[in-house]
From Swiss-Prot:
Keywords: ATP-binding, Glycoprotein, Kinase, Leucine-rich repeat, Membrane, Nucleotide-binding, Phosphoprotein, Receptor, Repeat, Serine/threonine-protein kinase, Signal, Transferase, Transmembrane, Transmembrane helix. The active site is at D795 (proton acceptor). This is Probable LRR receptor-like serine/threonine-protein kinase At1g53430. It is found in: Membrane. Its main location: membrane. Residues 669-950 form the Protein kinase domain. The modification Phosphothreonine is found at T658, T829, T834. Residues 29-609 are extracellular. The chain crosses the membrane at residues 610-630.
Length: 1038
C-alpha cells in the first residue's frame, strides 16, 4: 500500500507542476520571435544601444525610461498590446525614442511591425528619408521633428489613411507637397514648418476637414493663401509665417470659428489689402498678422476677443486710432502695433497698462509725457515731428539728438559686460528685457526690442556661449550676444553728420558643434542699415563657416545725415524655432563697431607748418589756374590755327594718353571690344597696362558733328567733377584721332538693370533703388545749380544713367547737354530728347529750362520704383504711359500699387510713397511748379517734407488738361510713327552691340538732323494733332 500511495502522490505532484507551468506560460505575454528580430534590427540601425530586446520585454518594461537631467530629456517609451492569443502574445504598438540624438537612418523595418500605430523619433540626428514601407502598417501618429531627413515629401504617407498626426517639422525636406495628402481625411495635425517645401498648397488638402492644427512656417511656397482653408472648420491653430505666399488673407477665414491661434506673416503682393474679416473668431488667444500688407483702421471687434493674450499687427499700413474697445482686453499680455501709421492720442488705458505694448514707429498726433525708458510701453519714434522740442527726443521721428551731436564713434558689447579690446572700450549691454523695450542709458546709444517667443514666453533675451564654442584667441565679445524673437534695433545716437564705417560682429553660440540634435538649428533673419536692406535671409553659421566662428559684416560709407545711425535686425518667420529648445531663433548680434570716415576735429589749432603748407598749396593752384587761362585765351604762346593743335593746347584737368596706349588697351580697336555707338562714333572697352579698365569714345570721321563740337564737349565735361557724373579720365589727340577716355562702368545702364532680359536684369533691392534715385538727383542738382556753368542735360532717361560696381548712379552722355543762359531759354530749331521723357513745354514748344530735366527725372524715378518702362508698360488700353497710370492711382489713393512686385514686401513703404509723390511733383505739367533738383535731393533724403501736388486731374471741369494730354499723345504717336523707325533700328543696333558695356546712345534724333525737321520732311499726317496743339497753346492748366 505504501508504494501505491507513493506512486499516486508522485502523479499528483507531476500533474500539479504541469498545470502550474502551463499557467505560467500563458501569463508570460511574450513577443513573437520575428518581432524581436525586427526590433533588434531597428535599434541597431538607429544606433541605439540603451535597450535590450527580449521576448519578455513587454512584461518587464526595461525599455521605458526618461532621463530627467536636462531640457528635452531623452525619453524611451515602447508600448505593447498583449491581448492576442488569449493574452499570451504581445505586439508593439507605440515606439517613442525622443532626444537621443540617434545618428542612424530611419529603418524600413518599421514596416514589419504590423500593429504599430505610433512612431516618435523627435530630436535625433537621423538622416536619409522616410521609408516607403510605412504604408504597410496602420500608422496613426508620425513625428520626426528635429532631424536631418531630406528628399521630397514622402508620397507613401498619402496612402496611410489611418494617419491622424503628422509632424515633419525642422528637417530638410524639399519639393512640392503631394496631392495625395488629400486622402488623409482622418488627419488632425499636419505640421511641416522649417523645411524647404516649394510650390502651392495643393487644392486636394481642402478634403482635410478634420484638421485642428496646420503649420507650414518658413517654407518657400508660392501662390496665394488658398480660399479652401475655410473648409477646415475644426481648425484651432493655423501658422503661415514667412512662407513667401501672396495676400490677401481669403474671406473664407471667417469660417474658422474654432481658431485660438492664427499666425500669418510676411505676405507678398502688388497692393495693400483690407483687414480680413475675423469678427466670428471670438475664441482667439494669439493673433499675429505681421507684415501682411494690411491697410486701413483696426476693427473695433478685436476688442471683443475676450480671451486674446497676444496681438501682433506690426509692420502693416494701419491707420486711424487705437480702438477704445481695446480697454476690454483683460486677458492680453502682449500687444505689438509698431511700424504702422496710427494716429490720434495714445489712450490712457494703454499708458497705464502693466503689460507689454509696442507702439513705436507710428504717427500719433498727441504724444504722451513718458520717460524714454518706459518699462512696459515702447513708444520710440511714434511722433512724426522732428523739431517739436516739447516732446521727448526718443518719441520723435529719427530720434534727434537732444543736444549738439558730438559723437563720432561707438563700441557696444551686445548682451555682455564692459570690455576693452586694444584701444577701444566696448560699453556693456546687460538689460535683460526685450518684449517691448527701449533702453538708452547714456543717450549715446540705445536698443529697441520687440516680440514674444513662440511656445516659451519666458525665454531670455541675452545669450551666452552655452556649448563653449569660442576659443581663447577670439575676442571676448563673441561669448555673449543679444537676441530678439522678432525685431531688434540698435541706434547710434548724437553722431556727427558724415560717412561712417560700420562693423556688425556675429557668432552663432546657441547651437552645438557636434552630431546631436542641438546642432540642427538654423537662424535666419534680415539686416537693415539706415532703413535700407543690407542682407536678406542672413544665416550667421552659414556665413561664418560654422557655429562658434566669428563673422564681421562690414559696411563702409554709411551716411548719417541727421544724428542717428539705425541698425535693424528682423525675423521674417524663417529658420527653426524649436532647436535646441523652443525660443531659440530670431536675430542675434555680438558686438557693434562704428568709426568715422572723416577726420575728427579735436579743437586743436593748426601748427605753423600746416598753415605754411596750405598757403603754398593755394598759391600753386592759383598760379596754375592763371597759366591755364592765359593759354586758353591765346596770351601764352598764341592760338594755334590747326584744330588738332588747339585740342592739344587745352588744359582740361585730365590725363593725356598716347594713341599707342589706347590701341594697346583696345587691341587696336578690335570689334570684339566695341561696346556701343555714341553720337560721335563707336565706344570701345579697353584695359590699360596697369590693369585699369576704361571706355574709349572715338570721334568718327563720318560724324557730322565736327571737331569743334568735340572741343566744346571735352571742355565742358573736364570741368565737371561729381560722384554722380561719368568721370572723364583724359583724352588722346594724335593726327586725325580724337579720343575721350572715360571710366568704365561695370553694371551697364539703369535701363538694362530694370527692363533687360532675365539674364541682364540685376534685380535691384529697395535700398539700391533708393540710392540710385538719390544719386541721379544729386548729379542733376550739380549740373543745374552747383557747377560754374548752368547745364541742362535734355535727355535724362534710364539708358543715360550708368551703374558702377557698387550700383552707384552716374549720369552719362553730355553730347546733348546744352549750356543754358537765362536770357535764351527758347530753342525753336532743335529738339533733342526721347519721347516719353520730354517735358510737355519742351516737346510742344521747344521751351527749354532746367525744369525739363526735372520732368525727365520724375519719369525715371517712377521707373525705378515700379521696375516698368514708361514708354512700354500699358496696364490698360486707355493709358499711354506709366505716368498716366500713376496719376490715376494717385487720385485713388493707391500709389503703392506701382511698387515693383519683384520687391515683395521688402521695401520701405514710407520711402516708396515719398519717392512716388516726388516723381509726380516733378512731372507737374507746369514747369514753374516743379521743384529745383536741390529741393528734390532734400526731399528724397527726408530733410524736408514733400511738397503737396498742385495739379490734380480731377480738378479740371473744362477738360482742358485732358485735351492737352490728348494732343501731346497724338504728337507722340505721330513722332513715333515718323521718326522712331530709324531711331528704334538704331537703338536696337546699339543695344545689341553694347551688352558687355555701359555705353549706349541716348539720342533718338539722326545726327545732324533735328526731330522737328525730320517730321516736316518725312510726313504731313501730324497736321491734325499740331492744329489741336495750336488751338490749345493758350490753355492754362491750374
Amino acid at each position: 500500500m505504501g508504494f501505491i500511495f507513493s506512486t499516486e502522490k508522485v502523479v499528483y505532484v507531476l500533474l500539479l507542476i504541469f498545470v502550474c507551468l502551463e499557467n505560467f506560460g500563458s501569463n508570460a505575454q511574450l513577443l513573437p520571435e520575428d518581432e524581436v528580430q525586427t526590433l533588434r534590427t531597428i535599434f541597431r540601425k538607429l544606433q541605439n544601444q540603451t535597450v535590450n530586446i527580449e521576448r519578455t520585454s513587454c512584461s518587464d518594461q526595461n525599455w521605458n525610461f526618461v532621463v530627467e537631467s536636462a531640457s528635452n530629456s531623452p525619453t524611451s517609451n515602447i508600448t505593447c498590446d498583449c491581448t492576442f492569443n488569449a493574452s499570451s502574445v504581445c505586439r508593439v504598438t507605440n515606439i517613442q525614442l525622443k532626444s537621443f540624438s540617434l545618428p542612424g537612418i530611419f529603418p524600413p523595418e518599421f514596416g514589419n511591425l504590423t500593429r504599430l500605430r505610433e512612431i516618435d523619433l523627435s530630436r535625433n540626428f537621423l538622416n536619409g528619408t522616410i521609408p516607403t514601407t510605412l504604408s504597410q502598417i496602420p500608422l496613426e501618429i508620425l513625428s520626426v521633428i528635429g532631424n536631418r531627413l531630406s528628399g521630397p515629401f514622402p508620397p507613401q504617407l498619402g496612402d496611410i489613411t489611418t494617419l491622424t498626426d503628422v509632424n515633419l517639422e525642422t528637417n530638410l525636406f524639399t519639393g512640392p507637397l503631394p496631392r495625395n495628402l488629400g486622402n488623409l481625411r482622418s488627419l488632425k495635425e499636419l505640421l511641416l514648418s522649417a523645411n524647404n517645401f516649394t510650390g502651392q498648397i495643393p487644392e486636394s488638402l481642402s478634403n482635410l476637414k478634420n484638421l485642428t492644427e496646420f503649420r507650414i512656417d518658413g517654407n518657400s511656397l508660392s501662390g496665394k493663401i488658398p480660399d479652401f482653408i475655410g473648409n477646415w472648420t475644426l481648425l484651432e491653430r493655423l501658422d503661415l509665417q514667412g512662407t513667401s505666399m501672396e495676400g490677401p488673407i481669403p474671406p473664407s477665414i471667417s469660417n474658422l470659428t474654432n481658431l485660438t491661434e492664427l499666425r500669418i506673416t510676411d505676405l507678398r503682393g502688388q497692393a495693400a489689402f483690407s483687414f480680413p474679416d475675423l469678427r466670428n473668431l471670438m475664441k482667439m488667444k494669439r493673433l499675429v498678422l505681421r507684415n501682411c500688407l494690411i491697410r486701413g483702421p483696426i476693427p473695433e471687434y478685436i476688442g471683443s476677443m475676450s480671451e486674446l493674450k497676444t496681438l501682433d499687427l506690426s509692420s502693416n499700413m494701419l491707420t486711424g486710432v487705437i480702438p477704445d474697445t481695446f480697454r476690454n482686453l483683460d486677458a492680453f499680455n502682449f500687444m505689438f502695433l509698431n511700424n504702422n501709421s496710427l494716429t490720434g492720442p495714445v489712450p490712457q488705458f494703454i499708458i497705464n497698462s502693466k503689460e507689454n505694448l509696442d507702439l513705436s514707429d507710428n504717427n500719433f498726433t498727441q504724444p504722451p509725457t513718458l520717460s524714454c525708458n518706459q518699462l512696459d510701453v515702447n513708444l520710440i519714434s511714434s511722433y512724426p515731428s522732428v523739431t517739436d522740442n516739447s516732446v521727448q527726443w526718443c518719441l520723435r521721428e529719427g530720434l534727434p539728438c537732444p543736444e549738439d551731436a558730438k559723437q563720432s564713434s561707438l563700441f557696444i558689447n551686445c548682451g555682455g559686460s564692459r570690455l576693452k579690446i586694444g584701444k577701444d572700450t566696448y560699453t556693456d549691454d546687460l538689460n535683460s528685457r526685450g518684449q517691448s523695450t527701449f533702453s538708452s542709458v547714456s543717450e549715446r546709444w540705445g536698443y529697441s526690442s520687440s516680440g514674444v517667443w513662440l511656445g516659451k514666453e519666458d525665454a531670455g533675451y541675452l545669450a551666452t556661449d552655452r556649448f563653449n564654442l569660442i576659443n581663447g584667441s577670439t575676442p571676448e565679445y563673441y561669448k555673449t550676444a543679444r537676441l530678439s524673437p522678432q525685431s531688434l534695433k540698435y541706434y547710434g545716437l548724437c553722431l556727427r553728420r558724415g560717412s561712417y564705417k560700420l562693423q556688425l560682429h556675429f557668432a552663432e553660440i546657441m547651437f552645438s558643434n557636434d552630431q546631436t540634435f542641438n546642432s540642427l538649428g538654423r537662424r535666419i533673419f534680415d539686416i537693415y542699415v539706415q532703413g535700407n536692406l543690407l542682407e536678406r535671409d542672413f544665416n550667421i553659421a552659414e556665413r561664418a563657416g560654422g557655429v562658434g566662428k566669428p563673422f564681421i559684416r562690414q559696411i563702409d560709407g554709411v551716411q548719417v545725415n541727421g544724428s542717428t545711425l539705425e541698425i535693424h535686425l528682423q525675423w521674417t518667420g524663417k529658420g527653426t524655432n524649436v532647436i535646441p529648445t523652443r525660443g531659440v531663433y530670431g536675430p542675434l548680434i555680438s558686438a557693434i563697431t562704428i568709426t568715422p570716415n572723416f577726420k575728427v576735429d579735436t579743437g586743436k589749432p593748426l601748427s605753423n607748418g600746416a598753415v605754411a603748407g596750405i598757403v603754398i598749396a593755394a598759391c600753386a593752384v592759383f598760379g596754375l589756374l592763371v597759366l591755364v587761362i592765359l593759354r586758353l585765351t591765346g596770351y601764352l604762346g598764341g592760338k594755334e590755327v590747326d584744330e588738332n593743335e588747339e585740342l592739344r593746347g587745352l588744359d582740361l584737368q585730365t590725363g593725356s594718353f598716347t594713341l599707342k596706349q589706347i590701341k594697346r588697351a583696345t587691341n587696336n580697336f578690335d570689334p570684339e571690344n566695341k561696346i556701343g555707338e555714341g553720337g560721335f562714333g563707336p565706344v570701345y572697352k579697353g584695359v590699360l597696362a596697369d590693369g585699369m579698365t576704361i571706355a574709349v569714345k572715338q570721334l568718327s570721321s563720318k560724324s557730322k558733328q565736327g571737331n569743334r563740337e568735340f572741343v566744346t564737349e571735352i571742355g565742358m565735361i573736364s570741368a565737371l567733377q561729381h560722384p554722380n557724373l561719368v568721370k572723364l579720365y583724359g583724352c588722346c589727340i594724335e593726327g586725325k584721332e580724337l579720343l575721350l577716355v572715360y571710366e568704365y562702368l561695370e553694371n551697364n545702364s539703369l535701363a538694362r538693370a530694370l527692363f533687360g532680359t532675365e539674364k541682364q536684369r540685376l534685380h535691384l533691392d529697395w535700398s539700391t533703388r533708393n540710392k540710385i534715385c538719390i544719386g541721379i538727383a544729386k548729379g542733376l542738382a550739380y549740373l543745374h545749380e552747383e557747377s560754374r556753368l548752368k547745364i541742362v542735360h535734355r535727355d535724362i532717361k534710364a539708358t543715360n544713367v550708368l551703374l558702377d560696381l557698387s550700383l552707384n548712379a552716374k549720369i552719362s552722355d553730355f553730347g546733348l547737354a546744352k549750356l543754358n543762359d537765362d536770357e535764351n531759354t527758347h530753342i525753336s530749331t532743335r529738339i533733342a530728347g526721347t519721347i516719353g521723357y520730354m517735358a510737355p513745354e519742351y516737346a510742344m514748344r521747344g521751351y527749354l529750362t532746367d525744369k525739363a530735366d526735372v520732368y525727365s527725372f520724375g519719369v525715371v524715378c517712377l521707373e525705378i520704383v515700379s521696375g516698368k518702362s514708361n514708354t512700354n508698360y500699358r496696364p490698360k488700353e486707355e493709358f499711354v504711359y506709366l505716368l498716366d497710370w500713376a496719376y490715376v492711382l494717385q487720385e485713388q489713393g493707391s500709389l503703392l500699387e506701382l511698387v515693383d512686385p519683384d520687391l515683395g514686401t521688402s521695401f520701405s513703404k514710407k520711402e516708396a510713397m515719398r519717392m512716388l509723390n516726388i516723381a509726380l511733383l516733378c512731372t507737374n505739367p507746369s514747369p514753374t511748379l516743379r521743384p529745383p533738383m536741390s529741393s528734390v535731393v532734400s526731399m528724397l533724403e527726408g530733410k524736408i517734407k514733400v511738397q503737396p501736388p498742385l495739379v490734380k486731374r480731377e480738378a479740371d471741369p473744362s477738360g482742358s488738361a485732358a485735351m492737352r494730354f490728348k494732343a501731346l499723345e497724338l504728337l507722340s504717336q505721330d513722332s513715333e510713327s515718323q521718326v522712331s523707325t530709324y531711331a528704334r533700328n538704331r537703338e536696337q543696333d546699339i543695344s545689341s552691340s553694347s551688352m558687355d558695356g555701359p555705353w549706349v546712345d541716348s539720342s533718338f534724333s539722326e545726327p545732324g538732323k533735328d526731330v522737328s525737321l525730320q517730321q516736316q520732311e518725312e510726313g504731313r499726317s501730324s497736321s491734325s494733332s499740331r492744329k489741336l496743339l495750336d488751338d490749345l497753346t493758350d490753355v492754362k492748366i491750374e
